[in-house]
Curated annotation (Swiss-Prot):
It catalyses: 7-aminomethyl-7-carbaguanine + 2 NADP(+) = 7-cyano-7-deazaguanine + 2 NADPH + 3 H(+). The active site is at 31 (thioimide intermediate), 38 (proton donor). The keyword Ribosomal protein does not apply. PANTHER family: NADPH-DEPENDENT 7-CYANO-7-DEAZAGUANINE REDUCTASE. It comes from Chlorobaculum parvum (strain DSM 263 / NCIMB 8327). It comes from the Bacteria. Transmembrane segments: none annotated. Keywords: Cytoplasm, NADP, Oxidoreductase, Queuosine biosynthesis. Substrate binds at residues 53-55, 72-73. It is an enzyme of class 1 (oxidoreductase). Belongs to the GTP cyclohydrolase I family. QueF type 1 subfamily. Pathway: tRNA modification; tRNA-queuosine biosynthesis. This is NADPH-dependent 7-cyano-7-deazaguanine reductase.
Length: 116
């Protein structure tokens, strides 16, 4: 996944802690075992520091996963790593909720907190 796609902009309220929640209910990737499509909802919750994530670039970043054979756990951790690197938030959580396959659903949650 090309993390260079992710753009940020200056946070105009860096001295105030507030939470931003971004939800993508139409995330797609491919199961690396079966080659079948996977569908899920990605929820990103973060407290920005000096910069915020630009949404159009995030949309294009998510499209990088569309044809990639990658496990749920890898997707979730990769997204967190790339977004933390891009915007260096005070804290961030990425939660992925995957649609049922064979009657089983999966949710993966990973978090980051900046060192003080």
């Amino acid at each position: 996944m090309n993390k260079e796609i992710i753009e940020v902009f200056d946070n105009t309220f860096p001295n105030r802690d507030y939470t931003i929640e971004i939800v993508n209910p139409e995330f797609t990737s491919v199961c690396p075992k079966t080659g079948l499509p996977d569908f899920g909802t990605i929820t990103i919750t973060y407290v920005p520091d000096k910069s915020c994530i630009e949404l159009k670039s995030l949309k294009y970043y998510f499209l990088e996963f569309r044809n990639a054979g990658i496990f749920y756990e890898n997707i979730t951790n990769t997204i967190l790593d790339h977004l933390v690197e891009a915007c260096q938030p005070k804290s961030m959580t990425v939660k992925t909720d995957w649609n049922a396959r064979g009657g089983i659903t999966e949710t993966v949650t990973v978090s980051y907190t900046a060192e003080k």
